[in-house]
Each structure stands twice: as structure tokens, then as C-alpha cells.
């Protein structure tokens, strides 16, 4: 993107997506060579030296912990990512079949470790036994357990818990623990797959270096910071948004950077200026993405984050709320007026490795009315049990045409080699905004439906005086041809979808068109429209990776691609 876009208008140029097959072939070949090297004796020797001497820093991860969950693990019930194992007090989960792949990933990430050590000395002793169980089976390189999907978070958790564990460990157990941390931290910096997580791997390696006492920790810190600094400017945009365009990814990165900043301070190392700058920017963006119900907006593979977790991420920041109405680099606009708040996606999806969790949902929005989140998306995330179909256009509150989507994730060999990149998405998205005392206008236009010869324009007006939101969704032909309307008539069904939050309910009025929506506060809102047909259909909403039943309002019509069509609608408070 050339230059800094103005706050009142966002323009993202098209970017090419060619050569995906060749990229996949090269990535698969490189991955094979990498796996052979990682499993070799010379590599094992390389990451084993120099031998660590002990422990130094005790990094503090600001993420909230759940001692009650740790107590359940202590009693023999291991519950992770929607799966559960009954282990008994001394069972070994690493020698037992996991109930799902998601469970196995969380298990090997040591996602259970923070909650378990939060219980106290008994939890730390149980954690040491579990780590010993893991080491016995997976202590040497393994493509799954030592892969980027598991290793990064495991090193992070081990680094933060190491000194707490050491307090309950024998000398031999401490020696094993620091050796594990040194080998895995060094290995992190050699991984080239999953390049979208390079920054997070550098942070975890830096934490490991800070925790390792004496000279063995210093080279790891130096190497991690060398990898970290250029990645910070690439992954943290000028407005604080994450380069993946996921608000939740920004919050999780903020947690990681705060943890590293704390560890560097304990080690007596100054934090790089880029690290401090990234923390400030991420904090500002986090505040921008908080909606009126206190939760984070959910876009591009990020789930809704609750108030307690947000408060923990911002506890360091005493600057207070920023009055921002747009995130121009990230591609989002926020509209606030009366009791209605809207946040809209005004940018194209990320491309390449950054798009592995992106969604083909241009111009999607979320709407909060009187602090009730009424309109949202399915909230798919990589932790979700749902299929990648939830990344398509009809899984968000935007327009969908026929059975198509404004982009699609890779599948098959390409996805295996590269990851489930999003391809064929909107390449050009423009947004224009105008604010005055009467309200806010926002126009969004994108070419995500160019394969059907159409552009989608979403025009929104938030009337602060009438306390209502008016919208118009129109589909227009890409190339205007006066003679096209005289040709054969071809119609495509299209719909404007309003996905309801699971706590919201809707009913169609007697006129068959108007829809009454109520949230937890029981305040009613009318959605009036000029669609040909209106339906309330089933939907789903993901919360912590688990699907909850929800509904969606579907405004239906038809469009001739040579002519275009539109649906107008209005959201206004019900009387009484």
C-alpha cells in the first residue's frame, strides 16, 4: 500500500495471487528437507549446546488463569478444547489416545500448565510428572509435538512456569527442565514453516533465553531479538492492528510482548524501541476493537474476547480510552450514535501466509444496540470445531450471491503444503466516511464478486438524532454495457445476512417482512426492509472454539448481473 491512507477514506489496491501451486510444491520440498535435518544427530547436538546452567528470570504472563480448572486436572480430569480424558491422579495423557486432534494440540502445547501451577505446590508437582511423561515419549524431535503448531506455546508456558516448577523439583528434575527449555527454545528459531507465526516464535525463544541463567541464555536472547525487531514492524501496523487483521490475534500478541518485556527487565536487558512501540500500538488498537457490550469484535479468525481478558491485556496501560473512529491501516471503521454502535470490515482479506485464518467476508459488520450484541458473524477461529466453510461469505453479516463466496480457503495438497490460505478474495476495497452532528455516513465498495461480474456496495447511515441505522446493499455490474440489459435474462439469487448473537432472538412480524430483534436486555429493535423475501434461518456462533446455536436473518432477492439490484433496510428501536 503506497502511503498512509487518510482516516476518512481507505483505499486498498489489488494484489496478485498467482503461482499458488508452484509455491505449494516448493514449500513441500523445503519442508521435507527441513524435517530430515530436524531429525538428524547433528541437529540434536546443535540445539543441545551450550549446556544450560540453571534458571534466571520468572516471566509474568498477564493472561488470566483458572485455578479451578487446575484443580480438576489434579483430581484426574483433563479437559482441553472441548475434549476430555479421565486420567486418575497419576495417569499419563501422552501414552493415551487423545479424543480429538484439537485436544492433542492443546495437550502438547501445555495449555494446561498455567492453570495447574496456579493451584499451588501440589499442582506444580503434578505438572512436573506430566512434563516427565511428555519427555519420555516426545523428548526427541517429532514432527507433530515439535512442529510450529505446538512448540511455540509449549516453550512460552514452560518459560513462564519454570521457576515455580523448580521450587518443587529435585536437582535432576531442574536439570531436565532447563535442558528441555534450552533445546526447544533454540529449535524454535530454526523453524521456517508457518511464517505467519515467526514473530510469536521469536518472542517465545526470547522468553526461554531470559529464563536460562548465565551465558547459555544470552545467545538465545540475542538471536531472538534479532529475529523479533523486523517482524514487529511488519506484523504490528501503524494503527496497532495485527497484520492478519484479526483483533484477537492482536490481543494475544500484546500478552506475549508484555511477557517478554517483563522478562527482559528481570534479566537487566533493555527492551528494543520497536517492542515498546508495538505494545503501545497494540494497546490502542485493542481499545478501538472493544464494542459497547465490553467484548472484542470478532473478524478474520478471531473470536469475541471477554471483558476480563481484555482488562488483563490493558492493565499496564494507564492512558485510558482513545477516541478513535477508524483503524486506517487495519481496514476497519467504527460508527457510534445514540444507542447503536457498528464496526465494519473495510479492507481486503490478508493474502499468502497471513491469510491462513482469514475470512472471505468483505464489508461484514457487527452491531451492538443498547449494549446488546445483536448482529455478529459465526466467529470462526482456528480453534473452532467447525469446518473452513465458516470462513465463507455466507457465515458473516454481509452479502452473499448464489452459492458462491467472495474468496475461498485452499484445500487438498495446496493447503497441506502452504496452510489453508484464502485465495480469490476481494482485491480492491474502498471506504469513504463522513461525520457530522446528525450522524455518520460510511460507504464500502469491493470487488469480491468480480468472478460473477459484480461489485458490492454497502452504504450505511447511522442517524444519531433518530437513533437508527439505515443501510443499502447494492450489486452493480463491473462493466456497464447499455446493450447488456437487452440480452438474455439471467438471474442470480442474493441475500443480505444478519447473523444473530446466540443471546439474541428474532421473530418475523405479520407483514412477513419486518423482523423484531431482542437481546439480553429485552429491548426490541425492528429490522425493516424492501427485500423480496425474509427468512429466519439456523446459524452457529463459536465461543472458545465450541459452536453455539444461533439464528440469522436472511433478506432475499435476485440480481441480473448485467443490470444490478439492491436491498434497503433500516434498524430502529421498537416502541415500548
Swiss-Prot record:
It is found in: Cytoplasm; Cell inner membrane. GO terms for biological process: cell division. InterPro entries: Chondroitin_lyas, Hepar_II_III_C. GO terms for cellular component: cytoplasm; plasma membrane. Its main location: cytoplasm. Keywords: Cell cycle, Cell division, Cell inner membrane, Cell membrane, Cytoplasm, Membrane. Disruption phenotype: Deletion mutant grows with normal rates, morphology and Z-ring organization. In cells lacking other non-essential division genes implicated in cell wall hydrolysis, such as dipM, ftsE or amiC, deletion of fzlC causes synthetic cytokinesis defects. The keyword Cytoplasm applies. One of its GO terms (molecular function) is lyase activity. The keyword Thylakoid does not apply. Membrane anchor for FtsZ. Binds and recruits FtsZ polymers to membranes early in the cell cycle. May also improve the efficiency of cytokinesis through the regulation of cell wall hydrolysis. Interacts with FtsZ filaments. This is FtsZ-localized protein C. It comes from Caulobacter vibrioides (strain NA1000 / CB15N) (Caulobacter crescentus). The lineage of its organism: Bacteria, Pseudomonadati, Pseudomonadota, Alphaproteobacteria, Caulobacterales. The gene is fzlC.
